[in-house]
Amino acid sequence: MPKQKTHRASAKRFKRTGSGGLKRFRAFTSHRFHGKTKKQRRHLRKASMVSSGDFKRIKAMLTGLK
C-alpha cells in the first residue's frame, strides 16, 4: 500500500503550534479594505486557531507535517 502524502495546499495554509494545535490565517485580507473599519482590518491581521470541528479533518490532511 502506498504511503499517505501530505496535502500540499493545506501544508501551506496551516502551521502546527507547540502545544499541538493548528494555527490559521484569516480570510478577506487580499483587497477591498476601504469597505472595512480600522478595527476589522486590525483583527484580520491576527492569526487564529482552527476550530475543534475542523481539527480532525485538517489533521488527517497534514500527516507528514511536523
UniProtKB/Swiss-Prot annotation:
InterPro entries: Ribosomal_bL35, Ribosomal_bL35-like, Ribosomal_bL35_CS, Ribosomal_bL35_sf
GO process terms (BP): translation
Ranges of Basic residues composition bias in the record: 1-16
UniProt-annotated stretches for the region Disordered: 1-20
PROSITE patterns: RIBOSOMAL_L35 (PS00936)
Keywords of this entry: Ribonucleoprotein, Ribosomal protein
Entries under NCBIfam families matching the protein: rpmI_bact (TIGR00001)
Family: Belongs to the bacterial ribosomal protein bL35 family.
Protein name according to UniProt: Large ribosomal subunit protein bL35
